[in-house]
Each structure stands twice: as C-alpha cells, then as structure tokens.
C-alpha cells in the first residue's frame, strides 16, 4: 500500500513495505533542495532515478524538462504518479534502461545531470571495482553535460571515502577532457549524524560540479 508524504511541499507516494529504504531516500533531502535552486529553465537528466526524488525537485524548481532513467519499471511508474499529483509545468519523461548503456549511447546533452547510483561496494574487497564503476559512469555523464552546465554526482559506498571519490571524479574529467570546478560538497543531513567514534558512518558523499 502506498503512503503519500511531502518533502518541501512536494507531494509523493512511497511504498514503505516494498520500497528501498522504506520507499524513499530521505538522506538526500538537503541535496534535492540544492538541485531545486539551480533547476529553473534547465534541462535535467536524472540517472538511477528510482521513484523520482531528484526529478521532482528539479521540476519544482522550474526545470523546463526532466528525464528519469532507471532499470525498475515499478520505480518509474511511481515516479510518473509522483509527477502527476504535483501538476508541474515542466515536461517529464521516464526511460526504463540500465544506466551505463544509456549514458554511453545517448545523443543529447543536458544542462544538469544527476548521478545517484546504488552502493557499488559494501566491502573493502570490492572497492577497486567500485572505483572503476564510478569513474566510468562519471566519464559518461561528463561527456553529456552542456558547456557551462552542472553535474550532481554521488556515492553512498561507505568504503569509498571522500578523497577517493574526489580523485575518481577528477580522473574521469581528465579522461574526457572536461574542465570542472567544485561548487558544493554534499553529505547526509543532520538527522543522519556521524559519531566521532565511528567516522565510517559518513557514507554519503557528493559533488556539485560546474562543467566547461
């Protein structure tokens, strides 16, 4: 059964029983609000969109168009419902595809691209493979940001720390020949506190990049 909730006056349905993390990633609340501030008049691509949290925030901020890409039909159906109940003026389109094939083969550039993948590594033994995956998706994302546009990119892998993530994004930019500048460094919100005795609790990290 779906439950309707609200975040910053945006209405949305969540599946608290079957959805991931009780149906909505509340740890991205502040970061969605940040995207909203930059979205007015922009074209936005939200990859690994799930039920459309970042897409809804972009539309609420006045984005002209938003494309949500995810591999789950159920998540995309819910995203479409969430867009519908808010009656946004911007255009929204959902695409059921795996992220990497879509990013590698897309022929359209966007003002803003959001990359919010699942955790690519849950153990240190998988960290090297995860870093390669982060680099690859960010290379693909950076290729498709319009000059002067922005990339919102995240990692929720606890074993990939802030410096490793930063170094990986820098390598991706160098490989595809894009000049980037850091506008914001993002993390989980205050209701997901990090104990000084357990720094590993700081699992969510992100960057907002200006791309030239």
Where are these regions (language model features)?
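Non-catalytic substrate-recognition/targeting regions of SAM-dependent transferases
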Residues: 1-25, 33
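Conserved class I S-adenosyl-L-methionine
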Residues: 41-50
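Conserved SAM-binding loop of SAM-dependent methyltransferases across substrates and taxa
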Residues: 51-64
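S-adenosyl-L-methionine
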Residues: 74-114, 120
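Helix-to-beta-strand junctions that scaffold the AdoMet/dcAdoMet cofactor pocket
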Residues: 88, 145-147
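Mobile active-site "lid"/loop adjacent to the S-adenosyl-L-methionine
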Residues: 96, 110-140
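C-terminal catalytic and target-recognition region of SAM-dependent MTase-like enzymes
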Residues: 150-212
């Amino acid at each position: 059964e779906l439950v309707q909730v609200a975040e910053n006056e945006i209405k949305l349905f969540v599946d608290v029983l079957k959805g991931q993390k009780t149906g909505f990633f509340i740890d991205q609340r502040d970061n969605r609000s940040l995207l909203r501030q930059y979205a007015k008049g922009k074209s936005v691509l939200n990859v690994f969109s799930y039920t459309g949290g970042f897409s809804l925030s972009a539309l609420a901020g006045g984005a002209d168009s938003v494309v949500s890409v995810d591999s789950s039909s159920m998540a995309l159906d819910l995203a479409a419902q969430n867009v519908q109940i808010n009656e946004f003026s911007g255009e929204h389109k959902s695409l059921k595809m795996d992220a990497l094939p879509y990013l590698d083969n897309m022929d359209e550039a966007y003002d803003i691209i959001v990359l919010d993948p699942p955790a690519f590594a849950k153990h240190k033994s998988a960290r090297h493979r995860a870093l390669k995956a982060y680099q690859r998706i960010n290379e693909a994302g950076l290729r498709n940001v319009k000059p002067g546009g922005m990339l919102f990119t995240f990692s929720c892998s606890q074993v990939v720390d802030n410096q490793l993530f930063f170094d990986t994004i820098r390598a991706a930019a160098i490989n595809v020949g894009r000049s980037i500048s850091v506008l914001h460094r993002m993390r989980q919100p205050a209701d997901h506190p990090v104990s000084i005795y357990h720094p590993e609790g700081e699992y969510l990290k992100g960057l907002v990049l200006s791309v030239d």
